[in-house]
Each structure stands twice: as structure tokens, then as C-alpha cells.
Amino acid sequence: MSALLKPLDNRLFWPAVAIGGLLILAFVLYLQHVRGFAPCSLCIFIRLDVLGLVLAGIVGSLAPRSRIAGGIAALGMLAASLGGIYHAWSLVAEEKLAAQGMGSCKMFMGFPEWIPLDTWLPQVFQPEGLCGEVVWTLLGQSMAVWSLALFVFCLLVLAAKLAFGRRTA
């Protein structure tokens, strides 16, 4: 059983969360800038949720033995996972509506004036595509479905860490 719990060790877990999130962000930026797939506004929100996972992983990695850092990281991962589930689920619904000839999507993000990410980094945070348009699939499933699966997986892994990984460090 201890071999199964080893990945939940704080020294491995939080860096893996951060690196995994960075790899996902690198992949979607590759799809956008190399393959030419324009992100929609919900895609941008999903990017922010993945960025939340990265930040949670960094916080947890900075002080792997600190209960405070671990608690903040766990709350960050929980918030990012729940936000990601909400946004990915919304995008799956948009894709289904678009397949029926309906759906709507806003082309502006509405970031607060004090942190206008779409102005500061438009190449990353500026929506340019339509939400219901499926431009990439893997095994017959859209990126929205895979994003939903990723965030559900993150939530389950966090639950396992909190339930079983208390003293694995």
C-alpha cells in the first residue's frame, strides 16, 4: 500500500501538479500559435484554471513540510479544479448547442481593470475563437471533454491525497 501512496508525498506531488499544469499550458499554446487553433472565452477561463493548478503546485513545492503552505496549495488546487470543472462543463454544453445550430459565446473576457490579462498578454489570454467550434479531438473527444476529465481527475487525486496522504512525507 505504501508504494501506491508514494506519489502523494508532498515532495513529489506538488512539483508534479505544477509541472503537469505547465505542460498542459505549453500544449494549448502550441495548438494556438503553431497549429492555428483560436481559443474561445471559455478556453481562456480553462487556461486560468490550469494556471491555478500551476500556482497551487508552486506554493506546495516551496514548503513541502509546511501545513500552512500545504493547506493553501490544497485550497488552490480545489478552487482551480472546481472552476475547471465548471468551465469545461460549460464548454461541453456550448459544443452540444453549436452542433444543434445554437449557442452563444462572448468574445471579450471582462478582466478587472487592475489585472487586464487580455491586454497585458493578448497572445495567451485574448479569445479569438467561437466556444462551440470543435477544432481538435483525441480518441473522438473534444478538448473540452478532455479538460473536464483532467479537472475531475485532479479533484479525485486531491481527495486521495487529503484522505490517504497525510503522513507520506
UniProtKB/Swiss-Prot annotation:
Cysteines paired by S-S bonds: 40-43, 105-131
Annotated keywords: Cell inner membrane, Cell membrane, Chaperone, Disulfide bond, Electron transport, Membrane, Oxidoreductase, Redox-active center, Transmembrane, Transmembrane helix, Transport
GO molecular function: electron transfer activity; protein-disulfide reductase activity
GO terms, biological process: protein folding
Superkingdom assignment: Bacteria
Membrane side Periplasmic: residue ranges: 31-48, 90-145
GO annotations of cellular component type: plasma membrane
Family matches, as SUPFAM superfamilies: DsbB-like
HAMAP family linked to this entry: DsbB (MF_00286)
Function, as annotated: Required for disulfide bond formation in some periplasmic proteins. Acts by oxidizing the DsbA protein.
Protein name as it appears in the record: Disulfide bond formation protein B 2
Originating organism: Pseudomonas aeruginosa (strain ATCC 15692 / DSM 22644 / CIP 104116 / JCM 14847 / LMG 12228 / 1C / PRS 101 / PAO1)
